[in-house]
Structure formats: structure tokens, C-alpha cells
């Protein structure tokens, strides 16, 4: 589906001309990396495909490498995830040692082989592997790379957040389940399970808080991904704890078996629901950005439809202007044969000598054609002068037009798009409701399961009270920032002329949105089919006789739970996620559409409620938006700043020591050998007198020495 979306997105933007072949090659390799990792039958193959995805993410995030921000984001993602990968490699090495040189799943997950392993050593190995998952899935404290990864094309963002990369870390942790569920490790790995849940809870709240103040549409979704993945980590932590502390194998333990299977299944079901919803949200956001960008382009470029000048000509014109050199002077300097005309070779050498470009012949041809006005295959002075003058005038005009850079991703440049992009608005509404955990939609069933299972563990182990409170608080926070995003984009009046001229999306983009919207709305069907019952050895014991039985079972546990604590908990979570968070957003953002603008019938209740609440309360959040907390959240809680400072101090201190070692030890050794060689050669050179008598004497002495050595050996 994302590939289909990419065709409509990438092929209609002129900026991607002559580079789409590279995009699709890297894109398909990225997908292959994740597929290979899931199909791998050993941790070794998992690691190989894991690294392949790391390479592809670097290439795709930095796809527009000519932009400094994209190049920086690619390096940042690559290096940050490499930190986690170092720990993963050490953990795998420990696992390889513990299991006598085996990393195959069939061997390491065998109960008899697990029984031979020291529990403390296995806990350390799995803990180090978990750090690798933290880096890959952008969890605290290795989370800083994910927001910057939005520099890549939107299809890449959709793929990273929905189907690959960040999900790889979750898959790795889920793959550890047999270790935690082994009877031979009973009660030995509960501390690691708590750490997994605590990291997840911390990241869930932190990322949701930062999403509150984001104005970039894709970055809101990036922090949403970080937060929702943290939910899954928390759910996995709770499930792994239950698997490690409950006797759930064999006859007589059916209840415990059901608890473990459903806890593990809820986390994986949320991974599925999140993938569907987030893939749809990123594709919908890409459609919005695509159309906003095109609307801005048409508004500001309708008055000059000329093709942009080749960048080499722009650089040449700028070069001559800085050198204060006329076209005639430049022409004379490169007309090597004084023919009064410049051929392709002379022009190519001129660009090379000016350090502008060293182009192959096939790229020189369109450049020559841009200057060669009479079409004779050569350039004369008037043609060059006229072309360079035109290029400078275009640059000056473009600079005047773009003295304020327009940001097509900023929600501050959107608003009121529900009437202009109804299909996209519908997809984003359904996806947002799923992420929020709105009743009966996909994400509701899995998120409620994660919250319930985390609290189930918290009642048994007080340490889990922290992640349990985090996921409950995160439910309300998710409701706020997802509602804020939709309202700022689709409700209210257009924020500027560009938003007022946005048009609908093309078919290539609409089709995946239709399909993913349907799947997301089908969450109740999937839940009724037993999608939460994923675990080894489950064998369908908890699956229901019919779809109706499954539906009634899920509805009863969600809204009429027999346990009074979980009955109250489900409604508290629902109150925070579906009422408090969205209600606060409705009172602060959006509003009614402009007069004359109409929305689809299914939007009418949402927009009417938004207009009524905002019109009644008129809350002003300007003071809060300028507070110290808001500033800190806008700066990502200064993690990047502190990391940069720490790295600078560590790297700078290390570099000085390395420089001393380099100059004193490495260079010193080489220079000592060099000096010794020079001194020895000087002394040997003194023996070269040019006298035949001296040479005969040295030959005789050498012969006697050799004779003496041979005589000694023989004797």
C-alpha cells in the first residue's frame, strides 16, 4: 500500500525527477530487510537484516542529501541506532557463548537447552539486546533520531513508522518471550521485564508531552509513533513479567495461561493496529503536504512558467558576479582555439576549472542546449551573456518571492481542509480515533488491553505502578494531541491564501487510504476473531466458537467487566482518552468552517461540536504556550543540547588524548625508525668511496666472514 502511495507521491513532484530510480531501489531493499528479519530462523540472520534496515534508513532519510538538514538527520539516525547496535552485538555474543555457539531459534528456545544456562548471565544478555531495541525503536534515552527522520520523503516516513525500522525493536523484544516463559527461568527475569515496561512508560508520557507543542504535521505523528511504541513496550514488559512469574504451562493452569496469552497478544495486536493507523496517517499527512505545496507553487509561480535554470548555470552566473568578471572576459579565457565559439569540451573544462562541476557528456548536452540559442551546437558571446543575465534576473526574482520561506508541513499554514480534502480528512480522523483508543475502532481494543494488563501486574508488583500510571496518563495526552492535529489541519478557517486554494488528491494516493481506513474500522471484527490471542502454544484454546461469541466476549470485557477494579479502570481510561483529551483540544483549536464551505455529513457532528465548545469557552492558551514548560517541550526537553554537550566534552577530551598518543607513540615510532634509517644510511654512504681498492677489501672481508660462518656451522 505504501508502494502504491509512493507512486502517486514521488512521481508527481518535479524535485524527484532523475532520482526516483534510486528511491525505489532503496525503498524495496528497506522492505526486504524487514521481511527478511521477520522470516529469519536465528538471531544471527535477524541481526544481518537488522543492519540492512539501518543502512537503508540512512540512505532514505538522507534521500535529499543536498539539504544540510537531511544529511544531518541521516547521520544522526545512523549513529544513534549504532549505539544500540553495539549493545545488541555484545548481547548476541553472550547468547552465542551461553548456548555453545548456537543462535538458531530452534536451539536457544528449547527448554532443555535453556535449563543449562545461568539465569543471571541470560538476563544480562537479554538486557543488552533490549538496549539495541531501544535504539531501533526510538525509546528513551536513544529517541532523539526519530523526529529528525522526517527529513526523508513522506512514503519513507510511513514505512519507517508503520512497517519497518522502529517495529524491528519491538519484534526483537517479542522474540525474547520463550526465554521469559520457560519454567527453568521462573522468577529470574522479572527485573528485566520491569525495566522494559518502565522505559516504555517514560517514553510514552515524554513523547506525548512534546507532541503538544509541535506545529509540523509530520513531527506530531513522529512523536505519536514514539509514544505508541512505548505503549507496546509497556505491554510487552507486563506480558513478559506475567510469563516469568506465573505457572501457566500444563493442565490446571488454564486461567494463568489465558492471562499470559492475552497480555502478550494485546501488545502485538496494538502493534498491528498502530501499523495500520499510523501508515494511513502518514500517507494522509503526505497527501495534505503534497497539495499544500502544489497550491503554494501555483499561487506564486503562475506568472512565470519557465523551467528553472540548471544549477550549474546559476553557480556560474554567481561565480562571475562574485569575481566581477564579464561574460566576454570569461568567454575569452575559455575559448582555447580563438574561434569565437565554445564547444562542449571547452565549456566542460571551464566549469571544472572554476570548481563548479565536473559533468559527464550526457549531462553537458542539456546544459549546452540551455545556452545555445541558435542551435548550432556551439556557444558565442551574445548567447552566453544573454543567458547569464537571464539567470541572474531569475534568481533575484525568486529571492524576492521567497524571502519568507513557506513551510508546507506547518499546521499554521493549513486549516479548513475538511471541505477541500474529504477523503484525506476522513482517513486522518479514523486513524486519529484509532490511536486515541476511541471505542469500537481498532486501537481501542489493544490499548485497553495494555492498560488493563499493566495494572494487573501493578496490583501484584508495586514497581509496575509507575508504568501503569504512565499509560493511563498517556491515554488522555494522546487524545489531546491527536485531536489538536486534526482540528488545526481540517477544522476552522483556512490560515492563509494557500490553504484556501488546496485541491483534492490523486487516485494513487486515495486508494491506500480507502483500504487502511476499512481495516482500521474493522478492529472489532479482528478482536472478535481472537487477534489478541497470539503466543507460543496458545493453539486456539481461547478462540470462540463463532464471530458473535467473540464479539460478545470482547464487548463484555471492555464495557461490563465482572471485576469491579477493571470495570472502573476501563471507564477511567475511556474518560481520559475519549473525553478529557479531545474535549480540551476542541475548546482550544479549530472552529466552524467558513461560510459557503460544506463538509461531508460524517464530519458535521465533529465540526458542530468543535464550533459549539470553542465558541462557548473562548479559552486563551497564549500565556501557557509562551511558558518555560512550552519552551522546553518545543526544544525537545533539551535532550539534543545536553547530548551534544556531553559528546563534545567526551569526544574533545578523547581527541586530545588520541592526538597525544598519535604524535607520541605512533608518529614517534615512525619518526624514530626514519631517523635511525637516515643515520644508518649516512654511515653506509661513507663507505662508498669510489675506490676499487676499498671495494675489493670489503668483498674480501665479507667472503672471510661468510667462510667463517659456514665453517662454524659445519664443524
Give the residues covered by each predicted segment.
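Short helix-boundary/re-entrant hairpin motifs in multi-pass inner-membrane proteins
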Residues: 1, 8, 18-28, 64, ...
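Alpha-helical transmembrane segments
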Residues: 1, 45-53, 81-84, 123-132, ...
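Internal transmembrane alpha-helices of multipass membrane proteins
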Residues: 1-65, 84-86, 114-117, 149-150, ...
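Juxtamembrane/interfacial segments at transmembrane-helix boundaries in multi-pass membrane proteins
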Residues: 45, 52, 70, 86-142, ...
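Primarily EF-hand calcium-binding motifs
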Residues: 323-339, 361-382
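Aromatic-capped, Gly/Pro-kinked transmembrane alpha-helices
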Residues: 352, 530-572, 590-715
